[in-house]
Regions:
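Active-site regions of metal-assisted phosphoester/phosphodiester hydrolases
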Residues: 1-130
Length: 130
């Protein structure tokens, strides 16, 4: 039996003040180990339950359908991101909730990673109360 060691995983959280209210943005890199990455995603989203407007972005090491089922967040962008030299699948994601929408999604070929970068222009819907 061989044990695969995974590196520690974290999420960086920023709360941004915008003209349309506060937005919480999270960047993460989930495990490559099947099942473990789903658990990490569920725990991350549970920990962010109180955040009204939310964007979660990063390398999830999961396909889009699994990400949506596990997170219950809305995809803001789509595109094949891996492997960088000939991308055939999306494992990097931009997700949102709370009136956050995305337009102009783009996949970038950058020399910095074995993944391609995914970007989107964000818009915040102003709630009737504010």
């Amino acid at each position: 039996m061989q044990v695969v060691r995974d590196e520690p995983r974290v999420a960086a959280v920023a709360r941004l003040a915008t003209d349309d209210g506060e937005l919480t943005v999270v960047s993460t890199h989930l495990s490559f180990l099947a099942g473990w990455n789903l658990l990490q995603l569920r725990r991350l989203v549970q920990g962010l339950a109180g955040e009204r407007r939310l964007v979660v972005a990063g390398d999830f090491n999961l396909p889009p359908d699994a990400v949506v089922r596990a997170s219950r967040l809305r995809p803001l962008a789509a595109g094949a991101t891996f492997p960088a030299h000939d991308p055939v699948r999306q494992i990097d994601h931009l997700l949102g909730r709370g009136g956050v929408t995305g337009t102009g999604a783009r996949v970038w070929d950058l020399p910095l990673s074995d993944h391609r970068a995914l970007s989107v222009e964000l818009s915040l819907r102003v709630s009737p109360a504010g």
